[in-house]
């Protein structure tokens, strides 16, 4: 992923989504096969619909076409992050307390790098998860500096 491109796009997208009372969740710029994709994920407390995605896409496309900061031809995709939205910002982690989350760590904690459970707390430096292992429950502390990525998890 080209970090510079995502930072530039975030700077263009942030005022657009704020003006529409939406939240910028994430920006991805990836090459798949021969094509480049610029994916912008937006959300709000009530969720987002196709009209809101279209409005952000139209405004962002105009702004990016005018300034032309991206070196390759690309496909722009504006969408909701979905039910398993990534947890990236402080606010995301705070809002995830009490919900099911999936966390991948950079290095093993208690011999594991993948965890899925209910987030019991988040204090800015540590996540406390309640894991269910067969019929047992276990609390685990995960330091934020060990978190490679985190997302909400859907359970059935």
UniProtKB/Swiss-Prot annotation:
Alphabetical list of Pfam families matching this protein: DUF150_C, RimP_N
Annotated InterPro entries: Ribosome_maturation_RimP (IPR003728), RimP_C (IPR028998), RimP_C_sf (IPR036847), RimP_N (IPR028989), RimP_N_sf (IPR035956)
Gene Ontology annotations for the cellular component aspect, listed alphabetically: cytosol
GO aspect biological process, one term: translation
Keyword Cell division assigned: no
Keyword DNA repair included in the entry's annotation: no
Keywords: Cytoplasm, Ribosome biogenesis
Subcellular location: Cytoplasm
Principal location class: cytoplasm
Alphabetized SUPFAM superfamilies for the sequence: YhbC-like, C-terminal domain (SSF74942), YhbC-like, N-terminal domain (SSF75420)
Source organism, top-level taxon: Bacteria
Function description: Required for maturation of 30S ribosomal subunits.
Family: Belongs to the RimP family.
Record's protein name: Ribosome maturation factor RimP
Species whose genome carries this gene: Bacillus anthracis
Gene name, Swiss-Prot/TrEMBL: rimP
């Amino acid at each position: 992923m080209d970090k510079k491109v995502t930072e530039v796009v975030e700077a263009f997208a942030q005022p657009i989504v704020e003006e529409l009372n939406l939240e910028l969740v994430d920006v991805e710029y990836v090459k798949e096969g021969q094509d480049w994709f610029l994916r912008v994920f937006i959300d709000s407390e009530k969720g987002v619909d196709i009209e809101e995605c279209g409005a952000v896409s139209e405004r962002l496309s105009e702004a990016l076409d005018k300034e032309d900061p991206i070196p390759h031809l690309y496909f722009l995709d504006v969408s909701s992050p979905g039910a398993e939205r990534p947890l990236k910002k402080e606010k995301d982690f705070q809002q995830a307390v009490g919900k099911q989350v999936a966390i991948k760590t950079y290095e093993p904690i208690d011999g594991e790098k993948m965890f899925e459970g209910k987030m019991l707390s988040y204090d800015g430096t540590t996540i406390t998860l309640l894991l269910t292992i067969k019929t047992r429950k276990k609390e685990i502390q995960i330091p934020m500096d060990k978190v490679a990525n985190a997302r909400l998890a859907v359970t059935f």
